[in-house]
């Protein structure tokens, strides 16, 4: 399983530790206008510009095995590890 968090374009974090399962990515059906699905480890955006929580849910629910394998492969790259490290440094200095 891959963790995601969902955030709006204004950067407000809505859901943390979202797993790719047949579950919803809105919090209790409360959906803001536009969503971004982001890999929670590195901060890489997986998909941007989904207009509703329902669209967001459908996108995640229908991620193909190939897409999941591609994300898992990306997580093994040096670029990915650097992004994770950069995100952790940013969190330490901004949160």
Model-inferred region functions:
Residues 22:
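Short beta-strand or tight-loop elements
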Residues 26, 36, 82-83, 91:
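Intrinsic disorder/low-complexity signature
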Residues 69-86:
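Anionic, Ser/Thr-rich low-complexity intrinsically disordered regions
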Residues 1-2, 89-95:
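Short intrinsically disordered terminal tails
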């Amino acid at each position: 399983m891959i963790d995601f968090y969902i955030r709006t374009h204004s950067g407000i974090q809505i859901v943390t530790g979202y797993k790719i399962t047949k579950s919803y990515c809105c919090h209790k059906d409360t959906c803001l206008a536009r969503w971004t699905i982001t890999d929670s480890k590195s901060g890489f955006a997986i998909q941007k510009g989904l207009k509703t929580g329902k669209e967001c849910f459908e996108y995640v629910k229908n991620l193909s095995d190939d897409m999941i394998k591609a994300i898992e492969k990306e997580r093994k790259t040096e670029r990915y590890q650097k992004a994770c490290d950069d995100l952790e440094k940013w969190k330490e200095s901004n949160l």
